[in-house]
């Protein structure tokens, strides 16, 4: 397609186990996506749509959580790692296992190893992005990822926003900003 495409979906998702006591095994999940526009405006539009949908659904307070998969890409850029080594690093990041990350990154340049080991601590409010700029090695890809997150956060000031720079859910699918919105108790 040469045009922008907007998609939405809604339906029940069956879980083998409930997330918590007295919770349903078949929660309602809905989502929306925009294809065909690579700019931040599309990310902003879809986040605003998701936020508005949660507010209309009267789910209570809304929290936005964001990351950018290019942060890990920027750290690993230029490194020759096997698929197994990359998978092990991703697993350790997802578990926020700094001890395992330290072992896995021993052979990498210090700036890369230190950056990867810093990611599990880089979560919280927008100040995390300033901390990331101080402790992660600068590169065009890294700088762009952090600036994009800041740009979005500035335009979404009316919603509680958190960042988890080690969050790799959907890493293989996403190419930039990844976000999740939570209503009520999240």
Where are these regions (language model features)?
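A generic structural motif
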Residues: 64-66, 90-92, 164
């Amino acid at each position: 397609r040469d045009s922008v495409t907007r998609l939405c979906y809604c339906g029940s998702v069956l879980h083998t186990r409930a997330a918590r006591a007295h919770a349903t095994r078949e929660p309602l999940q809905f989502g929306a996506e925009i294809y065909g526009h690579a700019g931040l405006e599309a990310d902003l539009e879809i986040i605003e749509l998701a936020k508005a949908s949660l507010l209309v659904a009267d789910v209570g307070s809304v929290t936005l959580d964001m990351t950018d998969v290019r942060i890990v890409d920027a750290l690993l850029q230029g490194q020759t790692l096997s698929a197994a080594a990359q998978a092990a690093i991703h697993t350790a990041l997802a578990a926020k296992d700094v001890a395992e990350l330290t072992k896995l990154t021993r052979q990498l340049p210090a700036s890369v190893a230190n950056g990867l080991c810093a990611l599990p601590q880089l979560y919280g409010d927008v100040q995390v992005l300033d901390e990331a700029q101080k402790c992660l090695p600068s590169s065009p890809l890294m700088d762009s990822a952090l600036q994009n997150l800041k740009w979005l956060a500035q335009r979404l000031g009316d919603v509680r926003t958190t960042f988890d720079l080690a969050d790799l859910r959907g890493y293989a699918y996403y190419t930039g900003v990844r976000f999740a919105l939570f209503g009520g108790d999240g």
